[in-house]
Amino acid sequence: MQTLTSVYFYSSAGLVMLVFVAAVAHKLRQPNEFIRALVGYRLVPDVGLRFWWVLPLLELAAVLELLVSTGESRWLALSLLLLYAAAIAINLLRGRRDMDCGCGGETTPIGWGLVMRNIVLALLALPQHAPIDELMGLGVALTLVTFLLGTLGYAIVNQLCANSVRE
């Protein structure tokens, strides 16, 4: 059972790190696109838009947090994911569906699927106790397979969210 806990601990951290690394890369490569998305949410005052770089910096800090985490210090990643879910939900409740989420990658309109995706990612980022055992042999293989399946599942959900409004 301890091996399964280790598999979950490391693969969930790896998946959330991958999501944040992709988001940071997109925001830093295309800052104007990200700023446009921030403006679209109508949650940040104009003066706050000058500090757009704080979000990618916090996401990078969340990656580092997950990388060196003993499990109890995953609060930044969890908080950012819940913040993003709340920002999307607020705009959906306002009736605003025709805007880019600013998540990274190709343009993805906001929708309830993105809210659920971020909540699931937040659940994966929940602080937990680090496993004590060392991953060996089968445990490492299971972790890699779980991480790859999680990454594939994330990519599928992301594509479904991106396509949901286009139809």
Predicted regions and their residues:
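Membrane-interfacial helix-loop segments of redox and metal-homeostasis proteins
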Residues: M1-R166
